[in-house]
């Protein structure tokens, strides 16, 4: 099954969906998990062959998510998964006959003295979906075990029990085991990988809060179990082995965990910073832990390093600093005669700066956090909340979007989440979508990105003096125009010329953007880019297809205004000025994603409610399909070819129009009318002209009209035949040309029933009725169409 990753741009193949069951862990006051635990330890703590398989981990997490109560929201389901992982893996022994064995039972023959479950096929008539009945046997050999995660009954309201206890056996504990099928096994070395998926949807602060709440709720009996699994989530066993010798000190363990969580929030290029932190902590832990847990009110002095190095680190770690000659913030440090201020949420970063620059701060034994006699649970809670304060995101990604896969989900997941409007075909961020499709009933509009403006910061490898020293950060220092990939990059540099802001104007996909950054780095002295980038402006263009009376988009509109330099009508929707050109072509500036969809949907609502709109569903669907096949707008000549071919087939063949339409749709789907996006007629974008050359970009098809060259797209690139006819000069046409045009108009008269289309035809035909060959053409066409006199007459 395909799982789509929106953030990691990764597509993997995973297994199917499995249904989980619940099994009690305590029956008739007998704890069934005690004796089997020792034989299961080797399996849980040993290396797993699936830990290096990301598809297996994704499949395991997906099934944990799907086997949660249906009424829970996305974030609440993640909280439930976290609670299951904190309670950890468990095993319930059972004895079963060969003919009753099923996939949820794993072989592990041992002898139990306290008790084991003897399981057999359900023979009672209880109205439930249980598969087995059971009885408790003591001093009996166990043949199999149920493996899964420990949980609580109140959490697993929708998890079906596997065993019916209508006989004397009575489960008497609030704890149950959520058991997995034999194909799925969970081991402790999978915990960091599961945490990696969890942190996509919930923050580290949420994880700490849930952990502390769970310790308080379940009491001291399970505190040790929860803390152990909490450490495995953050791969504590590996960190302790490689960084420090293990010391059973609660403070030290928590500090190590918090620092490793902090590393997850920054980029891998900052390894040199944290390597020095680890080295100094491992060398003299007591000295540097005092700096690490220093209060925000203290103001230590840095005596090594340079101001440039401090700014460089702050930029790489994305830490905001303020500078002044007086102490203005509570959390600050002093360098020479200047004070450097941090926000109170960044106190841990200030303390890490102190360790990095090896600050000598007075060490008081009585105030050392290691020496303060505080209870472990309180100390644990305080340090967790103090060392790291992550900002919660306002929105979380919905996990269900990652499991969309064209009807391959089982019935339960489909009923739980409903149906989706579209399949996820790409894993590109919404800001970098090259085409956005908006569907509303019979209308479908494809909005194509014409260009986007992206802001990103960069750091230079070395100091290069390319600008005057008085230059401030808001002036352009350099401007680059690349042919491949096509982009224009403006550089805004600081006076030190180490940290720069890049303003990128480009058209293309997310992959082309990453490619462009690497090309830029090859031609400049850029050391690294401080991602993520910000798309601050995105412009899109769209065509309304199948609209016969195209002028309706620029007529009978309220609250619009016209530009003076070129004929463009502006509509204002949600404070966005949407420009309508000739022939139902529009541009939408500044917005992308959901904002773009909202603007276009309101324009579609105008089309649906306007009484003068005449809409051809076949032409609409055919051109929309052609756009989606080629992923770019249809050039002028390609559209005219398809339109004239359709009209000629309808006029020259006596077969039904539906057959012609079906034939044309088949040709479109087979790629007969495909085109290249490099066939665009002209452009004003400088970097696109740099690729093809200005001569090619200005090479627009022209015709000789009234001894002048006229561009064919002067009526609009999306113009249909009726729009062309409305601008023709009848006196300059030959008799044969007029005859052909009148035949086409008669065809439209016979097939257009809407008032808007009839009004348009009236205006066009009146022009032709005043021509010098009017009587001849009128009599010729009426004789050829005498079967239907009502439609042969021109409307007046």
Curated annotation (Swiss-Prot):
Family matches, as InterPro entries: Herpes_UL87_C, Herpes_UL87_N
Protein name, per record: Protein U58
Family that this chain belongs to: Belongs to the herpesviridae UL87 family.
The organism of origin for this protein: Elephantid herpesvirus 1 (isolate Asian elephant/Berlin/Kiba/1998)
